[in-house]
Amino acid sequence: MISQNTYAHPAFMPWKHWSAERLGIALAVLAAFGFSFKAIFVKLAYAAAPVDAVTLLSLRMVFALPAFLWIGFAASRAAPPLTRRDWGMLVALGLLGYYASSMLDFLGLQYISAGLERLILFTYPTLTVLIGVLFMGKSLEKRQVGALALSYAGIGLAFAHDLSIAGDLRAVLIGAGFVFGSALTYALYSAGAEPAIRRLGSARFAALAMLVSTTATQIHFFITQPLSALIPSGP
């Protein structure tokens, strides 16, 4: 019989013995890996049925809503009540990060490949660095300059690849513009989220910001789309 102490052994749960920095890096890599699949699934959804970006994003938000309601409730039970300043910060960042950024991203994927979209969208860390340097008094390190150069060189190569396949410069430019707007709004969100997370905690902030963006997305859907858009038209 296996005792409970056996499962606490490093061989069963090695992350229990990791440092905070190592665990943070592992979680960030896992998040980036999962985040990378989003564009692939969105492209598959566009190919499977005639659906617009607003409807698809609305469905995505609704499916995720129960999880964020639970996380927000659990994280807020023992926490102090939110002030007006907290709510203002949550509304602004929720609209910027998960509503505007996601909407621009879904619109861009109607025009460009998932590969180019990923490359452009993942420039948001470098954009966050630039925002910090230009507006928050932070310094730019040499390794960050190298990361910026590599990021934009990769975008140039992927852009040329998409253009050679699509043959439609206008479509590629429109799609790239939407996705770059998504990266920029998400970078602004990331820069503003740092003090919000310190004040509210990461789980509470993320859940409440997502609830704000979900509300905004549903309002956008009901204003611009008929309810029949939620009914699949394919076989």
PLM segments and residue spans:
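Small-residue-rich packing faces within the transmembrane alpha-helices of Major Facilitator Superfamily
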Residues: 36, 62-66, 152, 214-215
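Specific transmembrane alpha-helical segments of multi-pass solute transporters/efflux pumps
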Residues: 34, 39, 69-121, 157
